[in-house]
C-alpha cells in the first residue's frame, strides 16, 4: 500500500526524493539514514505530506490548498533566516531547495508556516521600532537633562550673588531720651496720648444746680464737694474746676462793673 503511494508521488514530482527532512543533530552521521525522503515519510504521514515541497510543478488545486498559498509559503521560507547547524546540503539538479526553517517554524500545513513567517517579520520590525523609540526617548531625556543643568547653573549663580550681597538692615528706631518724654500727663489719661483733657459738656440740669450752689457759697468745702459730685454724677475734680472757672468769671464781671461805676461817678461829679 505504501509503495503504491510512493511510486505515484515519485512520478508526479520528479524532484521530490532529493529534498531532505530537517534533522536535529549531527547531519554527517544521520544524513545517510534519511537520504531517501520518500521512503521515510510514506509510512508516517501517509499520502498527505512526504517531506517534499508540494508547490513545485503544481498548477491547479492540491491536497492542502491553492497554489498561491504554496507560493507564499515558499517565499516566507526563503525570506526567513536559516541557522547554519540546521542546514543540509542540497543534491537536487533541477532547482535549488528553499532554506530550511528553524524549529519553531516547522508545521504540518503550509498556511501555518506562512503565518509564523509573518509573525517573525512583524516581531523583527516591532523590535526595530522599539529600539528606535528607546533611542529617541533616551536622546530626548539627554536633551532634557542638559537643559535642566543649564537652567540650574544660572539659578545657582543667582543664589551665590544674593548671598554675597549684604542684606539691607532694618530701619533703626529713633532713640528717645528721658528729657524728651512727657512727664506732666494726667493720671487718668482721659484726654488721650497728648495729655490734653477733653472739655466736659455739662447738661442743663447740672449747670443749674452748680449755679444755685455758687450763688449761696462761692467756695466749697471738701465735704460739700463730695455731696454735689454724687448728686450730679460728676467727679470732684470736675466740680472744683467748674467752681474755679465760675469765680474767675464772677471776678471779671465785678471788676468791669466797679470800673464802670467809678467812671460814671467821676463824670457826674460837680
From Swiss-Prot:
- Compositional bias annotation for Low complexity: 75-86, 119-134, 154-166
What does the sequence similarity comment in the record state about its family? Belongs to the Antp homeobox family.
Per UniProt, the short sequence motif Antp-type hexapeptide occupies residue numbers 176-181
Q: What one GO molecular function would you report for this record?
A: DNA-binding transcription factor activity, RNA polymerase II-specific
Q: Which organism is it from?
A: Lagothrix lagotricha (Brown woolly monkey)
Q: What is its main location?
A: nucleus
Q: Which GO terms describe its cellular component?
A: nucleus
The record's keywords, sorted A to Z, are: Developmental protein, DNA-binding, Homeobox, Nucleus, Transcription, Transcription regulation
Q: Where in the cell is it found?
A: Nucleus
Task: Tell me the InterPro entries matching this sequence.
Answer: Antp_homeobox, HD, HD_metazoa, Homeobox_antennapedia, Homeobox_Antennapedia_CS, Homeobox_CS, Homeodomain-like_sf
Q: Which residues bind DNA?
A: 195-254
Q: What does this protein do?
A: Sequence-specific transcription factor which is part of a developmental regulatory system that provides cells with specific positional identities on the anterior-posterior axis. Also binds to its own promoter. Binds specifically to the motif 5'-CYYNATTA[TG]Y-3'.
Q: Where are the transmembrane segments?
A: none
Q: Which gene encodes it?
A: HOXA5
Q: Which Pfam families match?
A: Homeodomain
Put simply, this protein is called Homeobox protein Hox-A5
Which CDD domains does the UniProt entry name for this protein? homeodomain
Q: Name one GO biological process term.
A: anterior/posterior pattern specification
Spell out the residue ranges making up region: Disordered: 75-175
Q: Which domain of life is it from?
A: Eukaryota
Subunit comment for this entry? Forms a DNA-binding heterodimer with transcription factor PBX1.
Amino acid at each position: 500500500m505504501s509503495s503504491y503511494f510512493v511510486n505515484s508521488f515519485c512520478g508526479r514530482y520528479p524532484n521530490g526524493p532529493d529534498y531532505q527532512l530537517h534533522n536535529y543533530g549531527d547531519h554527517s552521521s544521520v544524513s545517510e539514514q534519511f537520504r531517501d525522503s520518500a521512503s521515510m515519510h510514506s509510512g508516517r504521514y501517509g499520502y498527505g505530506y512526504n517531506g517534499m515541497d508540494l508547490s513545485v510543478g503544481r498548477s491547479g488545486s492540491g491536497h492542502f490548498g491553492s497554489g498561491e498559498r504554496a507560493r507564499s509559503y515558499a517565499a516566507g521560507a526563503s525570506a526567513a533566516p536559516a541557522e547554519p547547524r540546521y542546514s543540509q546540503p542540497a543534491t537536487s539538479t533541477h532547482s535549488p531547495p528553499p532554506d530550511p526553517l528553524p524549529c519553531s517554524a516547522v508545521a504540518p500545513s503550509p498556511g501555518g508556516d506562512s503565518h509564523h513567517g509573518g509573525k517573525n517579520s512583524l516581531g523583527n520590525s516591532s523590535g526595530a521600532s522599539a529600539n528606535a523609540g528607546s533611542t529617541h526617548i533616551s536622546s530626548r531625556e539627554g536633551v532634557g537633562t542638559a537643559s535642566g543643568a543649564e537652567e540650574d547653573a544660572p539659578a545657582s549663580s543667582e543664589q551665590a550673588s544674593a548671598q554675597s550681597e549684604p542684606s539691607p538692615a532694618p530701619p533703626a528706631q529713633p532713640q528717645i531720651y528721658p528729657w524728651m518724654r512727657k512727664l506732666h500727663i494726667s493720671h487718668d489719661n482721659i484726654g488721650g496720648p497728648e495729655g490734653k483733657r477733653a472739655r466736659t459738656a455739662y447738661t442743663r440740669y447740672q449747670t443749674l444746680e452748680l449755679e444755685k450752689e455758687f450763688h449761696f457759697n462761692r467756695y466749697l468745702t471738701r465735704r460739700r464737694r463730695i455731696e454735689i459730685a454724687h448728686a450730679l454724677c460728676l467727679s470732684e475734680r470736675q466740680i472744683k474746676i467748674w467752681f474755679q472757672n465760675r469765680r474767675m468769671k464772677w471776678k471779671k464781671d465785678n471788676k468791669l462793673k466797679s470800673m464802670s461805676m467809678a467812671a460814671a461817678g467821676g463824670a457826674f461829679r460837680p
